[in-house]
């Protein structure tokens, strides 16, 4: 698809190979198509990289309840409390709480949980919530109006705190 090749040309995702970039772009576009939001699909190709990354994060959150919950209950709550500290303990606490609340999550192997923690941490770095995997603080994020409008029109206002948006 042209959006996928555009994502590749602009190096939207910092991955070394064209194949992995194209795969990620296609996954993102597939998630967006599931949202049935043409404005966001076209914004991915036309907006600056940081906006496109935010849109991809939102699409991932819509597709993955786990990511939605993490972004809302951990990241959103930290922004709400103006607590910029962040570390492995935040990921560990989140997964421990989930394991206590949910039998399915409780049945997951340690390997699976570790992999999910790595994925979430990488997503936070790619979307510039964190400077790198060793970062000990959250960066302030600014929700782009294109995405904010889409979130509101999709009735997803509950997720706005994950984007440091409280208005």
Where are the predicted features?
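Short, small-residue-biased leader/transition segments that mark boundaries at the very start
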Residues: 1-8
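Hydrophobic, aromatic-lined core segments that form the binding pocket/scaffold
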Residues: 11-12, 16-29, 52-54
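Basic amphipathic alpha-helical segments that dock to polyanions
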Residues: 22, 26-35, 118-127
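Long amphipathic alpha-helical segments with strong coiled-coil/leucine-zipper propensity
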Residues: 29-61
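Short acidic alpha-helical/loop segments enriched in Asp/Glu that coordinate divalent cations
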Residues: 41-44, 81-88, 103-108
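Positively charged, polyanion-binding regions of nucleic-acid-associated proteins
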Residues: 55-58, 62-84
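DNA-recognition alpha helix
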Residues: 87-101
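Accessory, usually C-terminal, subdomains that scaffold auxiliary metal cofactors
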Residues: 106-167
């Amino acid at each position: 698809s042209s959006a996928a090749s555009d994502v590749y040309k602009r190096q939207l995702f910092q991955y070394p190979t064209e194949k992995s970039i194209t795969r990620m772009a296609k996954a993102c576009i597939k998630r967006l198509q599931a949202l049935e939001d043409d404005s966001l699909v076209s914004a991915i190709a036309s907006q600056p990289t940081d906006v496109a990354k935010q849109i991809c994060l939102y699409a991932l959150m819509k597709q993955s309840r786990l990511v939605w919950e993490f972004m809302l209950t951990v990241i959103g709550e930290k922004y709400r409390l103006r607590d910029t500290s962040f570390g492995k303990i935040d990921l560990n606490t989140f997964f421990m709480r989930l394991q206590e609340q949910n039998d399915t999550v409780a049945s997951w192997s340690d390997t699976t949980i570790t992999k999910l923690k790595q994925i979430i941490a990488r997503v936070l770095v790619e979307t510039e919530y964190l400077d790198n995997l060793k970062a000990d603080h959250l960066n302030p994020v600014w929700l782009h109006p294109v995405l904010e409008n889409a979130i509101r029109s999709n009735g997803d206002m509950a997720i706005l705190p994950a984007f440091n948006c409280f208005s």
